[in-house]
From Swiss-Prot:
Organism: Anaplasma phagocytophilum (strain HZ)
Family annotation (PANTHER family): DNA REPAIR PROTEIN RECO
InterPro entries linked: ARFGAP/RecO, DNA_rep/recomb_RecO_N, NA-bd_OB-fold, RecO, RecO_C
Record-stated family: Belongs to the RecO family.
SUPFAM superfamilies to which the protein is assigned, alphabetical: ArfGap/RecO-like zinc finger
Gene: recO
GO cellular component labels: bacterial nucleoid
Biological process according to GO: DNA recombination; double-strand break repair
Residues passing through the membrane, by range: none
Summary of the function given for this chain in its UniProt record: Involved in DNA repair and RecF pathway recombination.
Stated name of the protein: DNA repair protein RecO
Amino acid sequence: MQWQDHGMIVSMTPYGDTRSILSVFTRNHGICNAMIRLNKKKQSLQIGDRVCVTWRARLANNLGYFNSCEIISSAFYAYFQDHSKLLCLSSVTSTIYKSVPTNDAHPILYDYLIEFAEAAECGGHWYNEYLKLELEILSQLGFALDLSRCAVYHCEDNLLYISPKTGRAISERAGVSYRHLLFPLPQILRDLHNGTHTEQCSRKEFLLCLQILGYFLHRHLLSDDSKFLEQRKEMTALIYEEEAF
């Protein structure tokens, strides 16, 4: 069996001196784990690289080999000067690798990942694309937030809170007495969820959204991953310091 697809490297595990097990999140085949023989060119492969791979194996459920792995865009050149971008890239590739089932195609999620990567690599604003990507991870894996209307009164106005239990929006009227138990609902997060926002969010908004989405990602998908919360704290601390500077 053989196929070719575009993807992003989400994990690399050394296997002896001349080989590695490479995990690539591809558009049409999901996460594929395969052996790759390393040479001087392939030794430069890194997590976050966008690649075109050719996979081959005797049977579909075999580990297989990547016969070719051509770099389309190198993560090193795009991210090495921006630590906050690099941490976000590292976080989202790790999240996808640990939460998306192997060989389970998610082309829409892949497209969101590439939109974030392209925005980050071009040097422009990328906060919105990153938040949309994390929202889509939750949605694609069955834990979508519902920020379109109040969970209690079903109204669409004055939505000020998010329930940490249900991931649903709560209106001011329904949540005022319990606001100390709820997340604030940033307008930017609601707009991105509903597909109605075009302006880029501020660093302050981005930090709040990272806190909220990080909570739901950890609760639903990464509860056994102690490193996720540590990495999220490092991300928010760095972005906060950049804002203060």
